[in-house]
Design a protein with these regions (language model features):
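Extended beta-strand-rich segments in extracellular/periplasmic secretory proteins, especially
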Residues: 170-220, 277-354, 364
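Solvent-exposed N-terminal domain segments of exported/luminal and surface proteins
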Residues: 13-241, 248
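Gly/Pro-enriched, hydrophobic low-complexity segments
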Residues: 10-11, 15-44, 72, 85, ...
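N-terminal signal peptide c-region/cleavage motif recognized by signal peptidases
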Residues: 4-6
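Charged/polar interaction segments and conserved charged motifs
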Residues: 10, 49-52, 60-62, 118-131, ...
């Protein structure tokens, strides 16, 4: 849970020495599990699929020839309830009779990072610490800040400043109403750059983790709008956190946008989610108390190349749920973090539980 006052201590040199031995350079368990359903970490990374064109932006599924190991559906989901998140269990309870199912494929653990990132992560294990009630990291280099986490907030910071490489993304956002009809709510171009990973030898300090720009193209009422967000790499204390600006066509000027955060409804998805729902979670952790539940084997979405790169979004939007054939599920070890709204704080959600895969530290549920 969240420590107050003194800094949360880094781990000992003896503990940090496990990185690259029984733990991967990023702190995951190197070995597979007892029954072989989770393999050992693959330090070679994901194989490049035949036909991939560098710089094309279109990644080809390297596992396209694989078949599901098994399918979880209305007839058997309760046998797997222990390894399903509450969200997927709820989907079976509500939509199992309508054909909701999960195709579970072989697990792949090909998450790798540059050597300098591993070296910085090793230094961070003994050198980085949380201060200011978990709102700030001191002593971290551009790498994973807490490969051997001692608290819930250390786990969440690993997700919040996870590794990224610059990219552009054209995307469409749809929401499906209660009538089962999809409605286009946004067409946009998103550009993300990651300044803190461009200076690997310098402490993060005030260097941003990411700078995000979104140019809205549709619907017509939003065409021409621009959103710019600078997200900190180490410091959410007062005056140091997220900086956001908006350009609104009708006003013809750029203005600060402090409301682009927390539980403000996100117009990019027609207000059906909050700004801090994006990427499962983002932004300052200040409004919640955080509890580390532990690590557990669970079935989570992973390696869904078909969904992201091959299929048209509109073809995958069912009346009640996404096309199950487009989603790939795998068994992974995940960190589980629970959060409860602090007394005196305001948020649409009073409690949130997050699931982060051990290899990438990315929140997946």
């Amino acid at each position: 849970s969240l420590a107050t006052g003194a800094a949360l201590a880094a781990v000992s040199p003896e503990e940090a020495a496990r990185l690259g031995k029984d733990l991967t350079p990023m702190g995951a368990e190197m070995a597979g599990n007892a029954d072989g359903s989770i393999p050992p970490w693959n330090p070679e990374g994901t194989k490049v699929a035949a036909g991939f064109v560098p710089d094309s932006g279109n990644y080809i599924d390297p596992y396209a020839d694989e078949k599901p190991l098994y399918t979880i559906d209305a007839s058997n989901w309760q046998e797997y309830a222990e390894v399903l998140t509450p969200g997927t269990r709820a989907m079976f309870e509500k939509y199992g009779a309508d054909g909701y199912r999960m195709n579970v494929y072989p697990t792949h653990r090909g998450t790798i990072r540059p050597d300098w990132y591993y070296a910085n992560t090793l230094k961070n294990a003994t050198g980085a610490s949380l201060v200011a009630d978990g709102q700030k990291i001191e002593g971290n280099l551009p790498g994973l800040p807490f490969p051997i986490p001692q608290s819930a907030l250390e786990v969440m910071w690993n997700h919040m400043i996870r590794y990224g490489e610059d990219f552009n993304m054209d995307y469409d956002v749809y929401y499906v109403g209660s009538n089962g009809k999809p409605v286009l709510s946004t067409t946009a171009l998103s550009t993300s750059v990651f300044p803190m990973f461009k200076t690997p030898d310098e402490p993060v300090g005030e260097t941003p983790w990411t700078m995000l720009r979104i140019n809205y193209k549709a619907p017509a009422r939003r065409a021409g709008e621009i959103l710019l967000v600078h997200e900190p790499g180490a410091d959410y204390t007062e005056g140091k956190g997220r900086k956001a600006w908006q350009y609104l066509v009708g006003q013809r000027r750029v203005r600060l946008a402090p409301a682009v955060s927390f539980d403000t409804p996100n117009p990019g998805v027609a207000g059906t989610t909050t700004y801090d729902d994006s990427f499962i979670y983002n932004g300052s952790p200040e409004r919640f108390d955080w509890t580390l539940i532990g690590k557990k084997e669970m079935i989570v979405p992973s390696n869904s190349y078909k969904f992201v790169f091959e299929n048209k979004v509109e073809d995958m939007l069912g009346e009640k749920f996404l096309d199950p054939e487009a989603i790939r599920w795998e068994k992974h070890r995940v960190w589980i973090v629970d959060s409860n709204l602090k007394e005196g704080s305001r948020h649409l959600y009073s409690r949130r539980t997050f699931y982060l895969t051990e290899d990438s530290w990315t929140a997946v549920a």
